Amino acid sequence: MHSEAEESKEVATDVFNSKNLAVQAQKKILGKMVSKSIATTLIDDTSSEVLDELYRVTREYTQNKKEAEKIIKNLIKTVIKLAILYRNNQFNQDELALMEKFKKKVHQLAMTVVSFHQVDYTFDRNVLSRLLNECREMLHQIIQRHLTAKSHGRVNNVFDHFSDCEFLAALYNPFGNFKPHLQKLCDGINKMLDEENI
């Protein structure tokens, strides 16, 4: 028999927090010299809410807590590494030009995600999947000189999941279980668009 303390501990450890994860990833990447403030500036509250919702929908879809955590951890690590490279002027001119194209493509993706949610009967999983895979290819090119094969594997892990047409169809099913998640995701993405953070 479990005591109340043990049960509350189990519930507490079941909570996923992308903000804390971002701080952990930042510390691992840059070692002891880096403060928490860098990670918190890279992953703001709105981004954190979107990441938490992505975790919840991924966990519910995969029915696998470890897999969902791995996908979101890989997403956070990729975002942080990319931001560190960018902020420390590690990209050459070609990579910077590609980075600008990547930012525009991510913005287009965000607008499409929200539009497909807001306008009935416009959702096309192939369009979203294609946009996600275009982002993946650009990202691989941007980080090619800078990050390891393991990092490229993380990128693939993230995009393999989110660009999967079956996942996208489940997420956008107007009668499905994911409708509340999609609403929260789009609310967060809309806020990021308004704040020009995406």
From Swiss-Prot:
Coiled-coil intervals: 49-83
Induction trigger: By nuclear factor-KB (NF-KB) and TNF. Induction by TNF depends upon activation of NF-KB.
Known tissue expression: Expressed at high levels in the spleen, lymph node, thymus, thyroid, bone marrow and placenta. Expressed at high levels both in various tumor tissues, unstimulated and cytokine-activated cultured cells. Expressed at low levels in the spinal cord, ovary, lung, adrenal glands, heart, brain, testis and skeletal muscle.
Record InterPro entries: TNFAIP8-like, TNFAIP8_sf
Record keyword Isomerase present: no
Keywords noted in UniProt: Apoptosis, Coiled coil, Cytoplasm
Family: Belongs to the TNFAIP8 family.
Described function: Acts as a negative mediator of apoptosis and may play a role in tumor progression. Suppresses the TNF-mediated apoptosis by inhibiting caspase-8 activity but not the processing of procaspase-8, subsequently resulting in inhibition of BID cleavage and caspase-3 activation.
Name of the protein in question: Tumor necrosis factor alpha-induced protein 8
Species: Homo sapiens
